[in-house]
Design a protein with these regions (language model features):
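ABC-family P-loop ATPase nucleotide-binding domain
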Residues: 1-8
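A structural signal for multi-pass alpha-helical bundles of membrane permease subunits
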Residues: 8-291
């Protein structure tokens, strides 16, 4: 009887210990993630040479902080015009990539989930298998293919190779599996076409999945630097990440524009997250559990 009474107390004690450990680990991770962002943010209000000499830290001297870096960023001089040209290129490329990737991956996942056909499982296996292949292995064949198609130095050359993302297809497939198949039959009875069912009935239901993937796709496209650097040749087509990298030269570095421009470059992703954050958790949890 004493053992039975002591068992719940032991389980409760273990649960408290686990809760404290997990909370502490989470707090440490938050500090590690937040430190570079906070240090970079405060560094953007300091002289670039001072940041390079002393390094970025949270040991701040507010008397030396100023807005000169951001004034230079918005001054309209040659460096400022280049920066916002790269900024515009990144915005356009990210918008096109997100829209096309979501639509293509949704229809692929929808077809793999809602219809039965030969080699269905094998095709899905091939999709998942590509997740195990590092991009660096595919980079040279993709570059040769883009060159042979004549789309080098174009946005199409950057967008098309990554249009059918395996992880995005997998997420959409897991989400659509949780949707009731009776909706398809109801749509067919009402005379709706297969395309109409997928667009007018099923697509609105998958709004949380679209929002979740929009955030992840936007982050991936906005931060992508390696592949656009290989494809683009003209500086007028550079994205923000490539353009900022050109500010680092053996002959001198424009740290004022680099630091302030890096901080200002976070803004689009932050706005996208704030817009779609309420759908993010719903999309992740609904897609992870088949109802």
């Amino acid at each position: 009887m004493a053992k039975t009474a002591a068992q719940p107390k032991t389980m409760e004690s273990n649960h408290k210990v686990a809760s404290v450990l997990s909370t502490g680990l989470f707090a440490i991770l938050c500090v590690l993630i937040a430190f570079p962002l906070l240090a970079g943010f405060f560094a953007s209000f300091q002289e670039g040479r001072e940041v390079v000499m002393k390094g970025m830290s949270l040991n701040l001297d507010f008397s030396k902080m100023h807005l000169d870096n951001y004034k230079y960023l918005f001054s309209g001089n040659e460096d400022s015009r280049k920066y916002f040209m790269w900024y515009k290129n990144s915005l356009i490329l990210t918008l096109i990539t997100v829209v096309l990737t979501l639509l293509v991956c949704y229809f692929i996942a929808y077809g793999l989930t809602m219809y039965k056909f030969k080699l269905q499982g094998f095709l899905f296996f091939l999709v998942i298998a590509t997740m195990c292949v590092p991009f660096e292995i595919l980079m040279l064949p993709l570059y040769n293919e883009v060159t042979s198609l004549g789309i080098i130095n174009t946005r199409a050359g950057v967008i098309l190779p990554g249009l059918c993302g395996a992880s995005t297809i997998f997420f959409f497939k897991q989400y659509t599996q949780s949707l009731p198949k009776e909706l398809l039959d109801a749509g067919r009875i009402d005379g709706c076409t297969e395309y109409g069912i997928s667009v007018k009935i099923m697509m609105p239901i998958t709004k949380p999945a679209f929002a979740s993937m929009a955030i992840l796709c936007a982050m991936g496209s906005w931060n992508n630097m390696l592949w656009p650097m290989l494809v683009f040749r003209d500086t007028s087509k550079f994205t923000l990440q490539i353009g900022l990298n050109t500010l680092l030269t053996p002959y001198g570095n424009n740290y004022n524009l680099l630091i302030a421009g890096s901080m200002f470059g976070i803004l689009p992703i932050l706005i996208i997250y704030l817009i779609f954050q309420r759908y993010l958790i719903d999309g992740m949890t609904s897609g992870a559990v088949k109802g």
